[in-house]
Regions:
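Conserved short beta-strand edge segments in small beta-sheet-based binding/regulatory domains
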Residues: 164-169, 195-211
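C-terminal regulatory domains involved in ligand/effector binding and gene-expression control
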Residues: 1-76, 189, 202-211
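Short amphipathic alpha-helix segments
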Residues: 142-163
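Glycine- and acidic-rich phosphate- and metal-coordinating loops
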Residues: 59, 91-102
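Long, charge-dense
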Residues: 112-138
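Short glycine-/aliphatic-rich beta-strand segments at the starts of folded cytosolic domains
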Residues: 131-149, 175-177
Length: 211
């Protein structure tokens, strides 16, 4: 997987759906782990302690995912919520749909439609607010060069598709670069050729970040 979409950190998107006086409130956040998902689920349960159901679903970038019907009939709530997240190609997100019962049974089909609609509303709200971001597999590369070579190396890096994250000026110049995974290799080869073996390059481990 080279990239995926997720919700911005420290954001909670929400959406609502009403059907025959039952109120469905979808709450969507970014997570990095199962523990973070569980913590958010527990927080929502405390927030809506008086609700009939708090239905959770979450997906991690490593492929793990989980959902629960939280007392609703089997596969009428948690799975529809999860399917919306899958359909939006979201990873590292957790959605909890709270239901306040309105006194009328909606039936399996009605429940599927309601939980789907509430989750879709939360995803749409995040999209409209520009809160959905693409996370790309990137590789950090630190280059240490003498001052006379700085401009030349900077141009080479930018021509090679790098983004400059930061620059440190000391006895030498350290340029902190970020490449899409795989694009750092041609740059490193050109650096070895350009500097005739005198280059100092530190290549970090791949990670996911906005690029």
């Amino acid at each position: 997987m080279d990239s995926y979409f997720t919700l911005q950190s420290n954001i909670e998107a929400s959406g609502e759906f009403l059907d025959r006086k039952s109120r469905f409130i979808a709450q969507l956040v970014h997570i990095e782990s199962e523990d973070e998902a569980n913590a958010f689920i527990e927080m929502v349960r405390k927030r809506h302690y008086d609700a009939r159901h708090n239905v959770p679903a979450w997906i991690l970038a490593d492929g793990r995912e989980r959902q629960s019907d939280d007392g609703e009939p089997s596969r009428t709530s948690g799975m529809p919520t999860l399917e919306v997240l899958r359909g939006a190609e979201l990873k590292n997100v957790c959605c909890v749909v709270t239901r306040y019962f309105g006194g009328t049974l909606l039936g399996p089909g009605g429940l599927v439609r309601a939980y789907t609609a509430a989750t879709q509303a939360a995803v749409a709200a995040a999209q409209e607010a520009g809160q959905i971001v693409e996370m790309t597999s990137v590789v950090p590369v630190d280059v240490h060069v003498a001052y006379p070579q700085y401009e030349q190396v900077l141009r080479l890096a930018q021509d090679s598709g790098a983004k400059v994250a930061d620059t440190d000026y000391a006895d030498t110049v350290t340029i902190h670069l970020v490449f899409k995974a795989g694009e750092q290799e041609p740059f490193c080869a050109k650096m070895r050729e350009l500097m005739a073996g005198r280059e100092e390059i530190e290549v970090g481990a791949p990670e996911f970040a906005e690029f």
